[in-house]
């Protein structure tokens, strides 16, 4: 069976504000299965934002594990991310999961990959998924050349990615921490 895939998740941090947004399209092969999926969420009592790209079931499995790590480490985002990445890399079953996460709290944004990488994005901007490169390029240009808020930059970046990537639509969910 083909894997569910294709999405765009983008995060922008500017000053003491961060926004994380994603589109709503779920694709199975060349068929759009759902247009209004919610791939960006608030967890840990609303203090942490998380967005996911990749296999839907894989992403939900990782999201559950990440939430457990956050609880275990009292909301320490970096520690929870590193512990999840360690498990992801060493556990035989977890290694087969195909997904990526972007996580953000009031002070930190991290990208967590299936290779066991935990990346702190340069310049406070990162994006993942099939439309990630388009969204990241747009967000970087907007951040460098405008005074738009992180939420506005995320919204416009997702709009541009949705215009260019066939696996990304214009149904957006955007969460912020200010």
Curated annotation (Swiss-Prot):
GO CC annotations on file: HslUV protease complex; proteasome core complex
Entries under Pfam families matching the protein: Proteasome (PF00227)
One term of GO molecular function: threonine-type endopeptidase activity
Reaction equations catalysed: ATP-dependent cleavage of peptide bonds with broad specificity
Name of this chain's protein: ATP-dependent protease subunit HslV
Top-rank lineage group of the source organism: Bacteria
Role, per record: Protease subunit of a proteasome-like degradation complex believed to be a general protein degrading machinery.
Species this protein is from: Paraburkholderia phytofirmans (strain DSM 17436 / LMG 22146 / PsJN) (Burkholderia phytofirmans)
Top EC category: hydrolase
Residues noted as binding Na(+) in the record, renumbered to the chain: 162, 165, 168
Record-linked PROSITE patterns: PROTEASOME_BETA_2 (PS51476)
Keywords linked to the UniProt accession: Allosteric enzyme, Cytoplasm, Hydrolase, Metal-binding, Protease, Sodium, Threonine protease
Upper classification of the organism: Bacteria, Pseudomonadati, Pseudomonadota, Betaproteobacteria, Burkholderiales
UniProt-listed GO biological process terms: proteolysis involved in protein catabolic process
The protein's assembly and partners: A double ring-shaped homohexamer of HslV is capped on each side by a ring-shaped HslU homohexamer. The assembly of the HslU/HslV complex is dependent on binding of ATP.
Regulation: Allosterically activated by HslU binding.
Family note: Belongs to the peptidase T1B family. HslV subfamily.
InterPro entries documented for this protein: ATP-dep_Prtase_HsIV_su, Ntn_hydrolases_N, Proteasome_sua/b, Proteasome_suB-type
Membrane spanning residue stretches: none
E.C. code: 3.4.25.2
Subcellular location: Cytoplasm
Positions annotated as active site in the UniProt record: 7
